[in-house]
Amino acid sequence: MESRMDQYEIMEQVGRGAFGAAILVNHKIERKKYVLKKIRLARQTERCRKSAHQEMALIARLQHPYIVEFKEAWVEKGCYVCIVTGYCEGGDMDELMKKLNGTYFPEEKLLKWFAQLVLAVDYLHSNYVLHRDLKCSNIFLTKDQDIRLGDFGLAKTLKEDDLTSSVVGTPNYMCPELLTDIPYGFKSDIWSLGCCMYEMAAHRPAFKAFDMAGLISKINRSSIGPLPACYSSSMKTLIKSMLRKSPEHRPTASEILKNPYLQPYVNQCRPLSDAPTPIRMPEKPLSTSRSNQRCTSESQSSSISCSDIDSTQSSDRSTSGGAPSTDSKLNDIRSIQDADRADSDEKCVTPEDLRGNKNISGAELKRQDSSKSVHQHHRGESKQPKIIEKIMTTLREESRLRENNSPVSSSGVKLTSAVSNKNQAEQSSESSRPHSGVSYSSKFGDISSNGWTNTSDECVDPVQVPLQLKQLSPTVEHCPKLKNSGSSTPEPAKQIAENGSSASGMSKTKSSPSSSRRPSPQRQTVAGIPIVPFTVSKRAHIKAESEKTPPRPAHSPNNSLHNLPPLIPISTNLSEENIKLGNSQAMPAPLEFVTAASKEDISFYSNSVVDCVEKAEPSEVFESNSPAYLTPPWTGPVLDAKGENGLIAIPCSEIHTGTLQKSMASNDDSSLSSPLDTFYLSFEQEFVCKDDSQSSKHGHSAVTLLSGEDKFTVQELLASTPVISPFVSSTSNTLPEDKSSYQSFKKQSDSHSGPPVDVPAQTIRLNSFLVSDEWPTSETVQGEARDTAASKLLNVVREDFDVRSSSCSTSTQPSGQTPVRSKLNVPETNLASNISIPSISEAVRLSTAMDVKPYTSEASNGVKEEASPAKEALDVTSFRQRAEALEGLLELSADLLENNRLEELAIVLQPFGKNKVSPRETAIWLARSFKGMMNEEGGRLSM
């Protein structure tokens, strides 16, 4: 049988989109150029396959002067979807703007294009089609510079006044209601059209930021820059009216066409579209083709469109040539249906989707959330971090999903909680967890890696749905996923429940098998304060899981903690606490603990071990194969962020500011300053480990908190004295078998007492030399926040890889050893820590081991940095990361040149050059290291 491809002569590839290649072809008989969009189904995920079929069927029934011309479509050999559209010689709008190099379009031309675009969008909306991916790279130009709107790969058919909720499109063009997970409708296309018109006028995106958090913030505030002064105020007002935050305040496409300022251009363009051009509906196979199209398009893309990867290239290019006859297109559609039936198994689509039963149409998949619309605006702010995580994760996982080619199994309903932990995220394909008000279809949704289940839904004619299809159809009840639920079982403030209702307040959420199997940590309390273990997992374990861990609030409404990973107890008010000690010592500052344990085994990396810290206070810190437990022998009222508890609970599955921020008692950024300040401080001061009876010198660990990428690494700094077992021991014998109480624990710890030893502390420096295998970023040191009472800056200790390996070996101890407890009498000159980071409101100066006096630092006046988004993996192709690296290198080079430090400047610039391969991580590492040294020298000179 002769293939339809034989009718075309392949000329060249003109673009590559999200789902396939765009090839310029020449029709052998017509001698006319077309664009062939060829999508190989075998290499696509189920989502991409459905999108290909949806685009093929949808564009076949669209006919408008300002929409790409449809020639024909078919399934080639059961494994390719071929869509032939007209070729646009003028390219796309994005390419044209780049060629102009900053020269603005005349206002008359912009308004003409605007009128053509609005006419096309009005045609789509009047036929209940939502484009969902309006952007400049999808606006094509003919040889006569007329508009053709294309790329319907994400389009969706909606019932009138209906809404959808799938997160699709290009982030810069997404509307606020989509980003806040509020169901959206046709007004989302109006927002995207406003973004396009702004970009066409200003030659820059309406909303642009270096990270997703900044972009979403600008979109939610509708914060746009001024348009060029060469345009009239009427045009500016028209563009801004489409970029209003509330969908109700945006005009519809038909209302824009009635705008008096645009009327002359609409009348000029309307003669081409005066004749009514309804959507083409074949007579005989009406129910078959439409049910086929709608059923195959029920599951629209529920992740970010990949078409913005190659936004300057497109697979939809068209001209205004004549369309084939209705009979030929009827045959095309029939052939498409036949091929779909023959290859239904190859495409991994249900038979109901492809066979087009006459009593079942896409109208039957009725949405359950159409009544829940913009009244849910109150959920927006609390859901924003999860939306950020969702968008960033789906962007990263898009290519991986296509490569794996693993459609979601239809054997059972798969649900994941929006606030599942990383173990739950790993087993999301196996667990089945009820969610109040939400039912997902495993056949029509993709489960993203961060535990969020995306579904796509469609609202069309209300027809009775058979039970079999109802089980497959996605229905989403949009309930606030972060609402406070009073139905959680209250617990005493002294205990932390490992299993129970999650801190997000979602009622009736079962724990996954992984969390139910995990042993509960020991619960110990002293003076009504819960003590929580803190473990730092090895980087190798965290690397693949950190992106999967969604943010979670730490406190439930009844002020108890539920279902939390290992946490750090941190006192929050160092200068106001009234410490009452039972051993009649002078009043020291409250202790702070940092300990680390390997999660899977006792093998430590040198950058994943943190020694126990106690300031002038007898205590015992130990760990076993289970998470470590910390018990402070002090009492006194302590205020947390809400003034109720003495702890700030910080999950440690990935230690960075983004996770810390999201795991506090509130999702509100304004409540983070006090608890986070103290948390930073606990890592950036030098600590002393002391006991009444025995002391020994051991390796100190400096934890450097980096504000740039919001991550920290740990350096093992070893003393020159004989090697002694580290303070953090891996023995399981020190853990009480019955996990009883603090008294039994302290009684056991007192059995290891010995004679005290006075040793000088080894001074350490918080620097930028990192042991981590991930690329570093510089920490911000504010000179004005340094305390003049401190004697000097901490000295530089630089470890080579031999020392790191030895520290790694010494940090790993065989089981059966008891922890070593030390007493350090350290001179004030070596202990004064005067390093201050922005957002730190308090600092602690350690005067002696017996007399530690807290004081309030001047750092509260420092500039508070905006919370950074969740940590991203190293990506040398990321424009934001490359921009930050370039800025740091330029700043460093300028400083070196100004100080006439040419040798160091030569070292910094050595990896760069025409004939050199310059690994960015190496160059950045050098830049941060030298910059940190310069900051230290500047601090010494200023004293």
From Swiss-Prot:
Give the disulfide map: none
Q: Where is the composition biased (Basic and acidic residues)?
A: 329-356, 379-403
Q: CDD domains per the record?
A: STKc_Nek
The alphabetical list of record keywords is: ATP-binding, Kinase, Nucleotide-binding, Serine/threonine-protein kinase, Transferase
PROSITE patterns given in the database record: PROTEIN_KINASE_ATP, PROTEIN_KINASE_DOM, PROTEIN_KINASE_ST
Q: Report where it is expressed, by tissue.
A: Expressed in anthers, pistils and leaves.
Citing just one GO molecular function, the answer is: protein serine/threonine kinase activity
Segments forming domain Protein kinase:
8-262
Indicate yes or no for the key word Secreted: no
* Polar residues biased stretches: 316-328, 404-431, 438-447, 728-746
Enzyme Commission identifier(s): 2.7.11.1
InterPro entries (alphabetical): Kinase-like_dom_sf (IPR011009), NEK_Ser/Thr_kinase (IPR050660), Prot_kinase_dom (IPR000719), Protein_kinase_ATP_BS (IPR017441), Ser/Thr_kinase_AS (IPR008271)
Q: What are its GO cellular component terms?
A: cortical microtubule
The positions annotated for binding ATP are: V14, G15, R16, G17, A18, F19, G20, A21, A22, K37
Origin superkingdom: Eukaryota
Catalyses which reaction?
Answer: L-seryl-[protein] + ATP = O-phospho-L-seryl-[protein] + ADP + H(+); L-threonyl-[protein] + ATP = O-phospho-L-threonyl-[protein] + ADP + H(+)
Q: Does the keyword Transferase apply?
A: yes
Any GO BP annotation: cortical microtubule organization
The family assignment reads: Belongs to the protein kinase superfamily. NEK Ser/Thr protein kinase family. NIMA subfamily.
PANTHER family noted in UniProt? SERINE/THREONINE-PROTEIN KINASE NEK, SERINE_THREONINE-PROTEIN KINASE NEK4
Return the protein name. Serine/threonine-protein kinase Nek4
Source species: Oryza sativa subsp. japonica
According to the entry, what is the taxonomic lineage of the organism? Eukaryota, Viridiplantae, Streptophyta, Embryophyta, Tracheophyta
